[in-house]
């Protein structure tokens, strides 16, 4: 996991980028680090804790995934064939679709965090990291960028390892609060985002993976918020 942290977070430790793709199974473990600061903010119930928690999250993980979300949305929403969509996604200028997607994801997270228990951000990050692993497991790269680089070493063993660590990290939260199981529904957002990427672009690149991570996290928080508000979760 040491090699993954500098890639998926802003934690100032040294890692070997060449070894990152050998540790894909550890994606879920990164959630322990990426969610630590925002979870603490929520636990302490600080004023405007929902806003501060989102700021703490992006302070930890950076804005790379949000940038990918913007590019992804621009590509998905443009009209035309697959080549035109890919061109729009790779355009350096952010369009209105990308801006809207980023604003909506931030809004959903900030609003949902008012309605969820303090550990929900950990569950959301756990789902987010697993969804990234599932995206790599498609082994359908778009171009020769980071997505293709990681997919070269993606295999059933790495995927199984990721699921095992996902379960190991989820179980203690469920023991603490059984209703935490509802967070599993958040993975549906990730699955849908993967399908959208494949349908629109025919493959998955780094921008798609970042978008999948953001959509899954926001979707998970939304599910947990609805469960808490309407189902007594």
UniProtKB/Swiss-Prot annotation:
The chain crosses the membrane at residues 24-44, 46-66, 96-116, 117-137, 156-176, 184-204, 209-229. Its main location: membrane. This is Adenosylcobinamide-GDP ribazoletransferase. InterPro entries: CobS (IPR003805). The keyword Lyase does not apply. GO terms for biological process: cobalamin biosynthetic process. Pfam families: CobS. Disulfide bonds: none annotated. It is an enzyme of class 2 (transferase). It comes from Thermococcus onnurineus (strain NA1). Its cofactor is Mg(2+). PANTHER family: ADENOSYLCOBINAMIDE-GDP RIBAZOLETRANSFERASE. Keywords: Cell membrane, Cobalamin biosynthesis, Magnesium, Membrane, Transferase, Transmembrane, Transmembrane helix.
């Amino acid at each position: 996991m040491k090699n993954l942290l500098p890639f998926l977070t802003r934690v100032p430790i040294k890692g070997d980028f060449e070894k990152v793709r050998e540790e894909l199974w550890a994606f879920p473990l990164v959630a322990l680090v990426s969610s630590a600061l925002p979870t603490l903010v929520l636990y302490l119930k600080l004023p405007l804790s929902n806003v501060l928690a989102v700021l703490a999250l992006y302070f930890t993980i950076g804005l790379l995934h949000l940038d990918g979300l913007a590019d992804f949305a621009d590509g998905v929403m443009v009209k035309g064939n697959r080549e035109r969509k890919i061109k729009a996604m790779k355009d350096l200028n952010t369009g209105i679709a990308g801006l809207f997607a980023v604003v909506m994801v931030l809004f959903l997270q900030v609003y949902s965090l008012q309605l969820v228990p303090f550990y929900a951000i950990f569950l959301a990050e756990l789902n987010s990291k697993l969804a990234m692993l599932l995206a790599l497991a498609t082994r359908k790269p778009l171009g020769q960028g980071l997505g293709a680089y990681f997919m070269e070493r993606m295999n059933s063993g790495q995927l199984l390892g990721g699921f095992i660590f996902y379960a190991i990290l989820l179980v203690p939260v469920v023991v603490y609060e059984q209703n935490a199981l509802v967070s599993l529904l958040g993975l549906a957002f990730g699955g849908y985002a993967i399908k959208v990427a494949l349908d629109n672009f025919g493959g998955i690149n780094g921008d798609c993976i970042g978008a999948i991570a953001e959509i899954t996290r926001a979707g998970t928080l939304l599910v947990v918020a609805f469960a808490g508000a309407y189902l007594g979760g």
